[in-house]
Amino acid sequence: MKAIVNVDREWGIGKDGHLLVHIPADMKMFRTETTGKIVIYGRKTLETFPGAKPLKNRVNIILSRNPSYTVEVAYVVHDPEELMKLIETEFPEYGREDVCVIGGDSIYRLLLPYCSAAVVTRTEASFDADAWFPNLDEDPAWTCVVVGETQEFERIRFHFDRYERVG
């Protein structure tokens, strides 16, 4: 399982339920990394999608604490154990790299212990955030194995990095 996230300098990921910055190259990378794969996210993240509808061309699994919560054309689970069982029984053909955790902050914190990799768009700017991703640079369980080439969009510098769990 891998996390896919866009963070600012302080590992901020969002404000008022929205991304901090929209970078076309980041959106393209996200589509490339997730199309045809399993994406896992929370209800609040779903509500930020166009029409509050699950992403097309992916297996959508939504984590919610609400036992009566349902979503058309998506699976809903209520805890990591139920999630793992669903993936093992319904989607055995998918490998670990085909399962993507895409947010929001509480889902990242809940599922990061299950992830072996993280694809991180590092934005070289600071924004006013109210949601954060754990700082992998300060976590000894993680190491950065790829620092991507610095790119720029509308005077915002960014790069695509890859972290892997140590051991």
Predicted regions and their residues:
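Enzymes that bind and transform nitrogen-containing heteroaromatic metabolites
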Residues: 1-167
